[in-house]
Regions:
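Conserved ABC ATPase "signature" region
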Residues: 107-121
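H-loop (His-switch) and adjacent beta-strand-loop-beta switch element
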Residues: 199-211
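Catalytic Walker B motif of ABC-type/P-loop ATPase nucleotide-binding domains
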Residues: 150-153
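H-loop/switch region of ABC-family ATPase nucleotide-binding domains
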Residues: 186-187
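ABC ATPase nucleotide-binding domains
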Residues: 217, 224-248
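Conserved ABC ATPase signature
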Residues: 125-129, 133
Length: 248
């Protein structure tokens, strides 16, 4: 069930008692989630934990078995998928791709590409883009909606460390300039520590949630990802605090 107004009037997106079953199998069970303006929420979890199913439910591509998803009135959603497969034989430029399924004003296209760091690619062939360039074009396409909520489903999968870092820099810039909330599925756990306000660890149910350092020290998190990962996250968090102190 989708409602027009979240029960929590401060939230722009609200999920309550969400359950998704396929063929009698529980994919998601009793999921509760609130998303607030300009907040960055990250979903983490092992493969097959239901992360992508939750994202597809939020954008309306999957209908929940029970429960509700409520979005505040007039809130626009931008979506960046994990990967989009295009026929490499199609002679399609970035400009043509970003105008599908309908044309947008040229200035709007230019601004979206600029905000995504892809302005130099407007005449490039989609088939010739690198992985990082392709994802920036997908981000630009999502920004054409001028989103209040930006949802990313493992949008950096397959990118190298440099490409991943550059992509997340654009996401942070977009969050500030658009004032949007960001909900992202990520396997880049060190990025979670640097960028997320709130983390949900999903394994069919929400195993644990909270600030990144709270989740990293949770027994449920450590059971899924191991003590070594928690130590790595603590290391990144420590250096993040050092950077903030030096900046001050």
């Amino acid at each position: 069930m989708r409602l027009a107004q979240p029960p929590d009037h401060d939230a722009i997106l609200n999920v309550r008692q969400l359950n998704v079953r396929f063929g009698g199998q529980h994919i998601l069970e009793n999921i509760n989630l609130d998303l607030y303006r300009q907040q960055v929420v990250t979903l983490i979890g092992p493969n097959g934990s239901g992360k992508s199913t939750l994202v597809k439910t939020l954008i309306g591509a999957v209908t929940p078995t029970t429960g509700q998803v409520a979005i505040a009135p007039q809130q626009r959603i931008g979506y960046v998928p994990q990967r989009l497969h295009l026929d490499p034989t199609l002679p399609m430029t970035v400009k043509r791709f970003i105008n599908l399924p309908r044309r947008h004003p040229h200035r709007s296209v230019q601004k979206a590409l600029e905000d995504a760091g892809a302005e130099a690619l407007i005449k490039a062939a989609m088939s010739e883009l690198s992985g990082g360039q392709f994802q920036r074009v997908l981000l630009a396409r999502a920004l054409l909606a001028k989103p209040d909520i930006l949802i990313l489903d493992e949008a950096t999968q397959g990118l190298d460390h440099r490409g991943t870092a550059e992509f997340y820099q654009h996401i942070e810039s977009v969050r500030r300039s658009y004032g949007c909330a960001v909900l992202m599925v990520s396997h880049d756990l060190h990025v979670v520590m640097r960028t997320a306000d709130h983390v949900l660890c999903l394994n069919r149910v929400i195993c644990c949630e909270g600030k990144p350092e709270q989740v990293a020290s949770s027994p449920d998190y450590q059971a899924l990802f191991g003590d070594q990962t928690a130590q790595t996250l603590a290391f990144y968090r420590h250096h993040q605090h050092e950077e903030a102190a030096n900046a001050g």
